[in-house]
Amino acid sequence: MKFSKIACATVFALSSQAAIIHHAPEFNMKRDVAPAAPAAPADQAPTVPAPQEFNTAITKRSIIGIIMGILGNIPQVIQIIMSIVKAFKGNKREDIDSVVAGIIADMPFVVRAVDTAMTSVASTKRDGANDDVANAVVRLPEIVARVATGVQQSIENAKRDGVPDVGLNLVANAPRLISNVFDGVSETVQQAKRDGLEDFLDELLQRLPQLITRSAESALKDSQPVKRDAGSVALSNLIKKSIETVGIENAAQIVSERDISSLIEEYFGKA
């Protein structure tokens, strides 16, 4: 597969996650699925369950469940990013740093898409729905700010400790880093339950930057330096080129079956 297509797959992966939540709010809920009913006889018209029946088959999900659902998709995105790096044989530190900077620059658009998605979910009325999602929307800027703080502190600590090629090491050690963060999040949630805390989100927000920083420090300090070739082309330029190659219209057509073309088009329009 050409590098341009692999790079473009990363954009699809990130934008599709937000788009699926936006256009199919039920994906963001934990389903209690009943066994499928037997097929109707040929001479009998199939029955379509009423919306009320469908809604009652979906259990409400707490804010921790939503967060863990989002975190659950991170390894897949990391694998795609790892594939991009492996597919391109030469990577200079400044190339990766440039990509990281580009991701940070695009983050407001991603956050806006997630914000829109969660707002859409919050506005969807269901039996037994509570204010967990609405509260998450209100606090989204705070969540993002705290996570960004943890990531930035991890990078600063790595530079201070003389870790070579911070960007490459972050990518190469991403699975281990994510695993450590998962463990920390799980431990925090369990501790909150033992302590009888009603607002797990508060506890998680307070500890998430420290969890990320601690995990990244360990992964970067113990990692082997990632070698790079001197004559590589900037990954960021290739990613931008891949978007130009595929084009907005083709991107929208590819994902039209999920009815997320409008969001993809909006996202690519900001690229």
Curated annotation (Swiss-Prot):
Cleavage by KEX2 generates 8 peptides ECE1-I to ECE1-VIII, all terminating in Lys-Arg. Only peptide ECE1-III, called candidalysin, shows toxin activity. Residues 1-18 form the signal peptide. Induction: Expression is induced by human serum and epithelial cells. Expression is regulated by the transcription factors EFG1, BCR1, TUP1, RFG1, NRG1 and AHR1. Expression is down-regulated by minocycline. Expression is controlled by a very long promoter of at minimum 1500 bp allowing a complex network of transcription factors to contribute to the gene's regulation. Changing R93A: Impairs secretion of candidalysin and subsequent induction of epithelial damage and inflammatory responses in vitro, and leads to attenuated virulence in vivo in a murine model of oropharyngeal candidiasis. It is found in: Secreted. One of its GO terms (molecular function) is membrane destabilizing activity. The chain crosses the membrane at residues 62-82. The keyword Mitochondrion does not apply. Its main location: secreted. Disruption phenotype: Impairs damaging of epithelia and induction of p-MKP1/c-Fos-mediated danger responses and cytokine secretion. Elicits a blunted type 17 immune response. Induced significantly decreased levels of cytokine/chemokine secretion by host. Fails to induce host mast cells activation. Secreted protein cleaved by KEX2 in 8 similar peptides (ECE1-I to ECE1-VIII). Stimulates biofilm formation. The N-terminal alpha-helix of peptide ECE1-III allows insertion of the toxin into host epithelial cells membranes. This is Extent of cell elongation protein 1.
